[in-house]
Amino acid sequence: MNLKSLTLTELTALLKEQGEPGFRAKQVYTWLHKGVRSYGEMTNLPQGLRDRLEQQYPICPPKVVRKQVSKLDGTTKYLWELSDGNCVESVLMRYHHGNTVCISTEVGCLMGCAFCASTHGGLVRRLEPFEMLDQVLFSQIDSGLPVSNIVLMGIGEPLDNFDHVMRFLELVNSPEGMNISMRHISLSTCGLVPKIDLLAEKKLQLTLSVSLHAPNDAVRNTIMPVNKAYPIEELIAACRRYYEATSRRISFEYAMIQGVNDTEEAAKELLRRMKGLPAHFNLIPLNYVEESPLKPSTRQAVARFQKLLEDGGITATVRRTLGSDIDASCGQLRRKHMK
């Protein structure tokens, strides 16, 4: 067990069972959420307690296997080695409104999306809550930059690791921890409808970001296998339920793929499907993936598509490409390391 995956209430109960006074748990919790690498750094704890915790509950901080820093915009990409030798990626991005870290939720991915490097090799395992938290903490410590925003858009499908992701959100939002507001967190999903409904029940004030990437089943089936289980009509219906439960506008991710989903008819079909649903479209220049034959849309096609959506009443922005000189698209660094 890693103590960093426990809430303050759980940690208090655990240490009380071991005869420690109640205030000790808050001390330990605070140190853990500052990103200490050993209990020896917890200077306000008795030496005996530090030694015992070190023996019983090792902290297991991740190691930086590789780090790339963009010369263009300072975007920093990390390849972390976990305690079992598996590797995951996170990316620290600098914006005028603050620093955002994009984290992984799984080692590998089951979903098999055609345009994504993360899915090659399949799912190895799901991350523990502390392993997600560590990506935020140690990105912040290594860079010296305070993290104010988190996006769960790295390797893995967050809703496929539902319970651990919910615990991570609770921890990172904790006032005694990093205290990052839910409104500063975005969670991405390829469209696991039952889990979207579960998330809606929790009424969290985060941003749900749905990887849509197609206007209909015919196109989506060819690039996103998950669509065969949860067709686009079911997915949009779940998004409507989510909005009704949370009053939070849905963000739709849309990778612009030349000749696949970037036509005028595709834009018009999206407008019909989205009618009445408060939504924002994030148009994404497609990342190059070695094994994929898919090509990015031209700038002109992206601009035309954006205008069609906006003329139809949907807010659409073209995602700013960060770290293009370091190949900051997710999954690339891990794959190269595995080779």
Positions of PLM-derived features:
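Helix-turn-helix/homeodomain-like alpha-helical modules used for DNA recognition
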Residues: 78-104
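Auxiliary Fe-S-binding modules of radical SAM enzymes
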Residues: 1-88, 240-248, 254-339
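Conserved alpha-helical substructure of the radical SAM core
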Residues: 120-149
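Canonical Radical SAM [4Fe-4S] cluster-binding loop centered on the CxxxCxxC motif
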Residues: 94-131
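Conserved AdoMet/S-adenosylmethionine-binding subsite of the radical SAM
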Residues: 140-149, 154-316
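Glutamine-centric residue-chemistry signal
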Residues: 27, 106, 132-135, 306
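Short linear Ser/Thr-Pro motifs
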Residues: 70, 104-105, 118, 188, ...
